[in-house]
């Protein structure tokens, strides 16, 4: 593997030719399209990863983020291009701002898939992603009257990373057949060969059918199928649309897999020698019955043989402990949309019933619901969790009945992140600091970061203060960016306490907000923090998730109250950034001091935001949940702030079903005061009574994710973190320990384990 040797002069000539004019005369958008074409040419010139066996990573989401800079880093031309533009009076960061972010994902699931594609290519593995080409993604988030509003988020331009291919399939449904078209995005490895992300679309999609906000005719499948990621499923039409959409994804994937295997010489009886399929969460589960259907109906294979073949090809990654996220679909939905799959599913269920006398493991239950995860577990050869605690919980409680049947299938693969995007691209200043001390070997072997934990730095105040200076620079950059793009003013000298992740009650943004109410009331009473605090949220709520939208409303109301209170604003600021996405994350994460990872213990499978923050020198404030457990083990008690009940305590409380939030409310004046503030005159003056009262009642009568039992411990942990922050040398050492121990969370390590234990591509 060799760094790209293209000279600055050669780059200049090629870019000038692509733009049709001198660099200095180009607009930022013209430079972006020119660089995009240059990068695509270079990526196509590189060899693709080869091998008899190929991985197909099927996922409903690929939250890939902007691609220009990441690709230039991987191709080895980033610094040369940056310098070339500067010499011609242009800024690469200004060029980057003109790039639209692909709307192909929502949260951690999609971001993980994107990191994995980067690492698969970097490690030289023969593996492609397969998904859908959503035109509008999830949605673009707006704030109106202190509430979330949604509108389409178009991203596909005439010049884009998408390359239209000749691959097209006829996808059958009950009442019609749709014709697909495959588009490819090149996936560049770091100084290595390339793979592809295959995205299927339809040429009959009609973007104009979207009406007010993001509403559209959910029954007009030929026009709407690939418009949105996760269409609103609060009604029957939306839920059936999900079936149509998922089947479109997997039927295309299955046909592509079989075609490529046959081209390489497979008899299809030996398909497992040519293809391994990673099912990323339950959305692609229908690939199992669809492959069986295609093998039996189009390739004349006997049913038992087809089941055997497919069972040796498919592996399943479980990403959740939440029962609601383990998809279950009524049989009638399949009858209405894809009746050809039902006989296959019934055969699969019948085989399970004849083998096991346990209704909890059946595929089709007594209520005629099809359990998608059950298909994956019975008819795949591997089931993995995504953090050590998560996998243990799957084995011991959530999937215990299956673990007893197939202990050999279960394994753990702790999630990881690509350091190319989340350090090299997002934080070049920190990258240069690290390189100065330990060289650049960490760019390929992240475990080399451990070399940072050396007296040369830890005992050297000058170097520790350089680390603090880098953090201060990133905070100033974030403050400037938010001012320019969102009109938000924050104090760069304050403590940046950040919680960025999709809005869900189990992630407990509501607990963070209650603490901020508590802090606001303390300041009003005269108890002021030594250093001002800026609490930053970034989160989208699913359009039909009412309580999640109420939590956003509460935070935005609190933001307005504090912003207009001259007594409090110098000491406390609450900010909810608009339309949180990868681009914003790349600005927020390097600037963070305290990383909020406060999910209810036992509910977060892993998390990857915690890893990105850690890598950039933030200190984690969190529960012993998900990958926080492994971060805790790596950095030790002194370099993380752990609070709250253990997963064992939480699981036991759920089993006993004896939790009453009102008891905690009555017993703790701080909880009562904070919760009552939600429906106080101040909040009602800027908020909507219906939303605020509904959230108040939800907390007081349900609090399903146990905000109140952890609240006191949470407040104490935050105050300890704020106090420790005042000792700048101590804090710099905490930062350094976190950075030095982050190497374990490289997605290169994760992918190496997937290949060693599951895929066996090498």
Language-model features and meaning:
Residues 1-762:
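A conserved ligand/cofactor-binding region detector
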């Amino acid at each position: 593997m060799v760094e790209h040797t293209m000279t600055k002069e050669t780059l200049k000539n090629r870019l000038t030719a692509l733009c049709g004019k001198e660099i200095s005369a180009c607009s930022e958008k013209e430079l972006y399209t020119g660089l995009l074409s240059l990068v695509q040419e270079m990526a196509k010139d590189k060899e693709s990863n080869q091998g008899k066996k190929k991985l197909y990573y099927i996922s409903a989401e690929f939250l890939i983020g902007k691609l220009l800079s990441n690709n230039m880093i991987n191709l080895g031309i980033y610094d040369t291009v940056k310098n070339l533009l500067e010499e011609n009076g242009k800024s690469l960061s200004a060029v980057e701002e003109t790039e639209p972010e692909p709307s192909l994902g929502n949260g951690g699931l999609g971001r993980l898939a994107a990191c994995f594609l980067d690492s698969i290519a970097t490690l030289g593995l023969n593996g492609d992603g397969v998904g859908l080409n959503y035109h509008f993604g999830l949605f673009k988030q707006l704030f109106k009257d202190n509430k979330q509003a949604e509108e389409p988020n178009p991203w596909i331009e005439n010049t884009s990373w998408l390359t239209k291919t000749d691959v097209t399939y006829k996808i059958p449904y009950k009442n019609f057949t749709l014709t697909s078209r495959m588009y490819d995005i090149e996936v560049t490895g770091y100084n290595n060969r390339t793979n592809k992300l295959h995205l299927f679309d339809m040429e009959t999609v009609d973007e104009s059918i979207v009406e007010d906000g993001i509403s559209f005719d959910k029954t007009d499948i030929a026009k709407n199928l690939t418009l949105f990621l996760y269409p609103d499923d609060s009604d029957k039409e939306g839920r059936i649309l999900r079936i149509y959409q998922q089947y479109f994804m997997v039927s295309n994937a299955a046909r592509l897999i079989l075609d490529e295997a046959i081209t390489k010489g497979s008899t299809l009886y030996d398909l497992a020698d040519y293809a391994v399929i990673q099912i990323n969460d339950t959305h692609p589960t229908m690939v199992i019955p669809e492959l069986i259907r295609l093998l039996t109906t189009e390739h004349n294979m006997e049913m038992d043989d087809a089941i055997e073949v497919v069972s040796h090809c498919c592996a399943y990654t479980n990403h959740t402990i939440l029962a609601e996220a383990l998809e279950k679909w009524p049989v009638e939905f399949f009858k209405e949309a894809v009746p050809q799959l039902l006989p296959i599913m019934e055969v699969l269920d019948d085989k399970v019933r004849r083998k096991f006398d346990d209704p909890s493991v059946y595929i089709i239950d007594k209520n005629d619901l099809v359990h998608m995860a059950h298909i994956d577990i019975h008819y795949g050869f591997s089931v993995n969790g995504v953090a050590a605690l998560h996998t243990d919980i799957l084995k011991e409680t959530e999937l215990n009945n299956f673990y007893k049947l197939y202990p050999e299938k279960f394994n753990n693969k702790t999630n990881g992140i690509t350091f190319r995007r989340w350090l090299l691209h997002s934080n070049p200043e920190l990258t240069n600091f690290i390189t100065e001390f330990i060289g650049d070997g960490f760019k390929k072997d992240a475990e080399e970061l451990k070399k940072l934990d050396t007296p040369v730095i830890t005992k050297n105040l000058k170097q520790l203060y350089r680390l603090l200076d880098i953090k201060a620079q990133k905070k100033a950059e974030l403050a400037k960016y938010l001012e320019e793009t969102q009109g938000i003013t924050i104090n760069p000298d304050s403590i940046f306490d950040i919680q960025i992740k999709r809005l869900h009650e189990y992630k407990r943004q509501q607990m963070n907000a209650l603490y901020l109410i508590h802090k606001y009331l303390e300041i009003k009473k005269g108890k002021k923090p030594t250093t001002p605090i800026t609490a930053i949220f970034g989160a989208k709520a699913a359009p039909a998730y009412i309580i999640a939208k109420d939590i956003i409303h509460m935070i935005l109301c609190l933001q307005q109250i504090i912003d207009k209170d001259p007594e409090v604003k110098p000491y406390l600021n609450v900010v909810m950034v608009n339309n949180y996405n990868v681009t914003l994350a790349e600005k927020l994460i390097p600037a963070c001091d305290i990383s909020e990872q406060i999910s209810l213990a036992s509910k977060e499978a892993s998390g990857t935001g915690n890893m990105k923050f850690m890598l950039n020198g933030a200190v984690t404030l969190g529960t012993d949940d998900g990958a926080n457990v492994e971060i805790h083990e790596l950095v030790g008690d002194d370099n993380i702030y752990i609070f709250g009940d253990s997963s064992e305590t939480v699981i036991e409380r759920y089993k006993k079903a004896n939790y009453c939030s009102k008891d905690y409310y009555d017993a703790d004046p701080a909880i009562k005061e904070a919760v009552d503030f939600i429906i106080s005159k101040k909040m009602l003056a800027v908020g909507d009574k219906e939303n605020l009262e509904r959230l108040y009642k939800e907390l007081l009568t349900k609090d399903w994710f146990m905000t109140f039992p952890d609240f006191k411990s949470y407040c104490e942990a935050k105050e300890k973190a704020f106090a420790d922050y005042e000792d700048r040398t101590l804090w710099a050492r905490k930062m350094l320990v976190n950075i030095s121990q982050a190497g374990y969370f490289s997605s290169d390590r994760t992918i190496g384990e997937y290949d060693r234990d599951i895929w066996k591509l090498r």
